[in-house]
């Protein structure tokens, strides 16, 4: 009320108010320097060429109470399950179309509907293992979903790095709050991907498939590969052999790949199944996936 900070944000506001204008400017400069040192950037595509930009950083943190976040997290988990059930139904029994809940033409005439996936049942029945859900807080104070990105969600590395920079420039915040960690994301991602391996191995071979250094999210591709201890590869580094298995080219010879974390659009991932002119993907990747030889 009357512009006073919410209870959960009060300590953060008090800390910021205790800093002079000069101190705030100094800490902001420290944050910008850290971003440059860490090489945190993204690419802006323009008609005149591609421009690398430093990641914009807001020094003022957003404070979300644990109880509120637990509710949001529960809702997002439920939403992710519902979306996966929907996709699995679309590519198999299509009950939701037959029952008229969703008009068939909306789905089947969509350019995002891939008939090549019809009849496939992936491991755990999960199609979208990583969901990028954009949230907004409305004027009523509640969180709403703006959109779901299930195809090639991007941006999580910036979240992890934002937290690291905040620790550097506002360490006092972490003395006053009990804050949920985010730096374990790469290990959580690794566990998720490892659970999909078609082979029962203690440490399956996982690769991150990137379009290359000129992609706007290349920083993230490299960040996640390094964090998981996975190989960062381009399409030319992989091939599908006569046994329908995916192999990675190495100096010691071919190495079988168990899981491909795809960071390229599906239209470009396999010229054998999708766009024939694609030079970014791996010919036969869909065939290998359908045969259960790779995830």
Identify the residue ranges that each predicted region occupies:
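Preference for protein termini
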Residues: 1-295
């Amino acid at each position: 009320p009357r512009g006073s900070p919410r209870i959960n944000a009060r300590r953060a506001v008090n800390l910021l108010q205790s800093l002079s204008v000069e101190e705030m400017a100094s800490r902001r400069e420290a944050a910008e320097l850290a971003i440059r040192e860490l090489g945190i950037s993204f690419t802006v595509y323009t008609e005149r060429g591609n421009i690398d930009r430093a990641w914009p950083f807001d020094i003022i943190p957003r404070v979300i109470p644990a109880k509120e976040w637990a509710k949001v997290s529960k809702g997002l988990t439920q939403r992710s399950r519902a979306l996966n059930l929907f996709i699995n139904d679309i590519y198999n029994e299509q009950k939701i179309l037959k029952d008229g809940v969703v008009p068939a033409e909306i789905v089947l005439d969509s350019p995002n509907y891939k008939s090549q996936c019809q009849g496939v049942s992936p491991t755990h029945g999960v199609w979208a293992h990583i969901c990028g859900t954009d949230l907004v807080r409305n004027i009523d104070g509640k969180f709403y979903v703006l959109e779901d990105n299930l195809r090639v969600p991007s941006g999580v590395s910036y979240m992890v790095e934002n937290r690291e920079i905040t620790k550097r420039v506002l360490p006092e915040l972490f003395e006053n709050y009990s804050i949920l960690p985010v730096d374990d994301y790469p290990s959580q991602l690794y566990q998720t991907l490892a659970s999909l391996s078609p082979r029962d191995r203690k440490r399956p071979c996982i690769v991150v498939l990137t379009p290359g250094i000129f992609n706007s999210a290349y920083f993230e591709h490299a960040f996640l590969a390094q964090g998981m201890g996975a190989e960062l590869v381009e399409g030319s580094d992989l091939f599908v052999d006569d046994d329908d298995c995916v192999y990675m080219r190495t100096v010691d010879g071919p190495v079988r790949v168990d899981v491909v974390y795809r960071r390229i659009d599906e239209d470009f991932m396999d010229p054998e199944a999708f766009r024939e002119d694609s030079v970014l993907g791996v010919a036969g990747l869909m065939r290998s996936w359908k045969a259960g030889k790779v995830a």
